Amino acid sequence: MASIMMNKSVVLSKECAKPLASPKVTLNKRGFATTIATKNRGMMVWQPFNNKMFETFSFLPPLTDEQISKQVDYILINSWTPCLEFAASDQAYAGNENCIRMGPVASTYQDNRYWTMWKLPMFGCTDASQVLSEIQACTKAFPDAYIRLVCFDANRQVQISGFLVHRPPSATDYKLPADRQV
């Protein structure tokens, strides 16, 4: 049995020793030449500076009311409870200035940083328009704050999802995907 395994490993090493062929160039539907590297953008490097991200949809441009409404519909179809939270620009991201890392007052929350809840969770919410009106009210009250919509599952007793629904007008943290890579 050992001799059989050795023979297989020898065959594998001979296959690996073959010289690499140049990447296969193919034409896409539009007639442009593509290679493996351009298909998966595998040669790009993530920009580590000024590339802040929030939660689920933070890589996308700001969501429209229609897109938010579709997400809220999905939340309500799954019987999850929507809830709005907001935070000032300087408190929205985890950092040494606004997080207590260790000590007697440190909680067991993921980064020991909380956003302020807007009113109470919307337990009786049945329509996306109710959530959109609360987003507008929160935006009117705190125009310079980040506002996110989170949803909770009462059965599993966990937060299911969270995404930004409002960025402050002065925010410069969003970048196009092409600008996030070098």
Swiss-Prot record:
HAMAP family: RuBisCO_S_bact. Its main location: plastid. PANTHER family: RIBULOSE BISPHOSPHATE CARBOXYLASE SMALL CHAIN 1, CHLOROPLASTIC, RIBULOSE BISPHOSPHATE CARBOXYLASE SMALL SUBUNIT, CHLOROPLASTIC 1. GO terms for biological process: photorespiration; reductive pentose-phosphate cycle. The gene is RBCS3. The basic functional RuBisCO is composed of a large chain homodimer in a 'head-to-tail' conformation. In form I RuBisCO this homodimer is arranged in a barrel-like tetramer with the small subunits forming a tetrameric 'cap' on each end of the 'barrel'. Keywords: Calvin cycle, Carbon dioxide fixation, Chloroplast, Photorespiration, Photosynthesis, Plastid, Transit peptide. SUPFAM superfamilies: RuBisCO, small subunit. It is found in: Plastid, Chloroplast. Belongs to the RuBisCO small chain family. It comes from Acetabularia acetabulum (Mermaid's wine glass). RuBisCO catalyzes two reactions: the carboxylation of D-ribulose 1,5-bisphosphate, the primary event in carbon dioxide fixation, as well as the oxidative fragmentation of the pentose substrate. Both reactions occur simultaneously and in competition at the same active site. Although the small subunit is not catalytic it is essential for maximal activity. This is Ribulose bisphosphate carboxylase small subunit, chloroplastic 3. Signal peptide: none annotated. Coiled coil: none annotated. InterPro entries: RuBisCO_ssu, RuBisCO_ssu_dom, RuBisCO_ssu_sf.
